[in-house]
Amino acid sequence: MKLRNLLSAACVALFTSTPLFAGDVMVMDAYARVASKVAKSGAAFMMLHNHSDQDDRLISAASDVAKRVELHTHIEEDGVMKMTKLKDGMIISAGGMHALKRGGDHVMFMGLTRSLEHGDMFELTLTFEHAGDVTLTVAVDLERQ
């Protein structure tokens, strides 16, 4: 394995394994993907754990890697899966967990301002209704299924 690939893998492992807190909400295992080097869009996935005794809501996300950053999900409509914007955000139940995963809820990056390659890292700010803002470093992991 080349040294660059080894270092990239180590950085991805380090940054995706370190949990961060926004108030009582813990963000874990964050990573991003793009379909190809020339993709105009990408997505981020992670696990959110609400340690408080009240529901919270992820209401927005922001990053300089894209012109627009939105909260999205997939829905089935007439037998066809479609991606749609979540206008009201994502609820994280009190004491519960919420997975942002492929084929489900996720952070969508549209109009990428730069290419995202395996091992790259960028900042993403998540805004929660009660817990406030948390800025995390997200690693691009194109090998993850």
Please give the residue ranges for each predicted region.
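Compact, glycine-rich, soluble single-domain proteins
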Residues: G23-Q145
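Bacterial N-terminal signal peptides that target proteins for export
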Residues: M1-A10
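N-terminal signal peptide c-region/cleavage motif recognized by signal peptidases
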Residues: T16-A22
